[in-house]
């Protein structure tokens, strides 16, 4: 896969992650006053970064030794990385057991919307470039 295809694919996948994150943040905000509600968050970026670094390292043809010693261990490629929703059980912000901080969630909401807008612009630019090349 060339760098253009990879960047388009990553931008598309990241838009899906941002949509999921938007939904999770909205759920947190909607339950700000629900007793014992635990906030959730979406994790994706750290695993994606690790997978990309692993792919780069394997593309450098590093000497790895005997693969039989890995006992079936397979490093994840960036296409294998999936977003995950994690519940925050450890923190308690209010006496009713709820741990949603509305200010933090609103900040996360705005930040997520800005990143989503940026990546939609990146996708539009990629497709505009392809359209120019085709013409």
Swiss-Prot record:
It is found in: Bacterial flagellum basal body. One of its GO terms (cellular component) is bacterial-type flagellum basal body, rod. The keyword Cytoplasm does not apply. Its main location: other. Keywords: Bacterial flagellum. The keyword Hydrolase does not apply. GO terms for biological process: bacterial-type flagellum-dependent swarming motility. It comes from the Bacteria. Pfam families: Flg_bb_rod. PROSITE patterns: FLAGELLA_BB_ROD. InterPro entries: Flag_bb_rod_N (IPR001444), Flagellar_basal_body_rod_CS (IPR019776), FlgB (IPR006300). NCBIfam families: FlgB (TIGR01396), PRK12622.1 (NF009265). The basal body constitutes a major portion of the flagellar organelle and consists of a number of rings mounted on a central rod. In Gram-negative bacteria, at least four rings, L, P, S and M are present, whereas Gram-positive bacteria lack the L and P rings. The rod consists of about 26 subunits of FlgG in the distal portion, and FlgB, FlgC and FlgF build up the proximal portion of the rod with about 6 subunits each. Structural component of flagellum, the bacterial motility apparatus. Part of the rod structure of flagellar basal body. Belongs to the flagella basal body rod proteins family. This is Flagellar basal body rod protein FlgB.
């Amino acid at each position: 896969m060339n760098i253009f295809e990879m960047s388009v694919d990553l931008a598309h996948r990241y838009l899906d992650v941002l949509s999921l994150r938007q939904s999770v943040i909205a759920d947190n905000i909607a339950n700000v006053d629900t007793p014992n509600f635990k906030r959730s968050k979406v994790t994706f970026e750290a695993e994606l970064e690790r997978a990309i670094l692993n792919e780069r390292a394997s593309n450098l043809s590093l000497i790895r030794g005997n693969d039989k010693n890995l006992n079936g261990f397979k490093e994840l490629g960036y296409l294998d990385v999936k977003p995950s929703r994690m519940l925050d059980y450890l923190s308690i912000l209010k006496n009713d057991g709820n741990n949603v901080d509305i200010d933090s969630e609103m900040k996360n909401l705005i930040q997520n919307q800005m990143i989503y807008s940026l990546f939609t612009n990146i996708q539009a630019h990629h497709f505009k470039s392809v359209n120019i090349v085709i013409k």
